[in-house]
A protein has these predicted regions:
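Low-complexity, intrinsically disordered segments exposed to solvent
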Residues: 17-270
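Sec-dependent signal peptide recognition
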Residues: 2-7
Length: 270
């Protein structure tokens, strides 16, 4: 998303300069920085959700084995306690140690702990992830990430409620960005290959909000479901409404690659 928003931000700045009541240059720069920070933080927490679900699915697959520890040459060590198919809640520990270069080219380190009340496909199951000195590349991740299985929708696709509370991402420079989320993810492709997250596609609806490193508040509301693909990572379609500082009702349309600012429509390239 960051590659998409970079040209968008240039348009935002241009649009801001056309308004008489716009903030000064410093405020404009802080607004742009806040949006750029959002793209990084959002990507990190979406990644947490994807990999957390993968860890729970992998744990279920291996629960009939004889070892509670799963080690991979190119992945983390996953520990499941209690290690059986029926006892819940389970604590699933995903340990990246001092650093693992994963299949998607991202280096992760530290520990993600997931407490699951049932298996990932079980309706009503909740999966609560917390972090112990966990890093996505050089960004430290904190907060509580909860996924709840809401069951099948009318199209027979699984829906999951996602809540992120007290989300915090600290950059290598020491500055921190705060983030929260209340969304619904609909699993529309890849559910028949549960051990391979890279063919997954999902629709995202709901709200996200946060505070930038400079204290700029922002909120984003999905107007039309965002269609995410994981490999190559991107947004295929959907409409996102953005309110940030004094810049309100910006619409980013990923379906036709346009952005609306102050009623003016501009194209962008994805």
């Amino acid at each position: 998303m960051k590659k998409i928003l970079v040209p968008i931000l240039a348009i935002v700045l241009m649009g801001c300069q056309e308004k008489e009541n716009v903030n000064n240059d410093t405020a404009q720069q802080q607004t742009i920085a806040a949006l750029l920070e959002y793209t990084v933080v959002n990507k990190i927490f979406q990644d947490v959700g994807n990999n957390g679900g993968d860890a729970v699915l992998s744990s279920e697959s291996s629960a009939s084995g004889k070892s509670s520890v799963k080690s991979e040459v190119d992945g983390p060590t996953i520990t499941v306690e209690p290690f059986d198919l029926t006892s819940f809640p389970k604590t699933i520990t995903v340990d990246y140690g001092t650093g693992v270069l994963c299949q998607d080219g991202i280096t992760r380190k530290g520990i993600v702990t997931i407490v699951s009340t049932g298996w990932y496909r079980s309706v009503g199951s909740k999966h609560t992830a917390t972090f112990d000195n966990y890093y996505h590349e050089n960004f430290k991740v904190e907060g509580t990430h909860v996924v709840e299985n809401l069951g099948l929708n009318q199209d027979n696709n699984l829906e999951y409620g996602v809540t992120i509370a007290d989300g915090k991402v600290t950059a290598p420079t020491g500055v921190a960005v705060y983030y929260s989320e209340n969304t619904t993810r609909t699993w529309i492709a890849g559910s028949d290959t549960p051990l391979n997250i890279w063919d997954d596609e999902y629709l995202l609806n709901g709200n996200q909000s946060g505070v930038s490193a400079a204290g700029v508040e922002y909120s984003l509301t999905v107007e039309e479901a965002l269609h995410f693909i994981l490999l190559p990572r991107g947004i295929e379609s959907g409409i996102l409404d953005v309110d940030i500082a004094d810049l309100n009702d910006v619409k980013i349309n990923f379906t036709n690659n346009t952005i609306t600012i102050f009623g003016q429509i501009y194209p962008f390239s994805s």
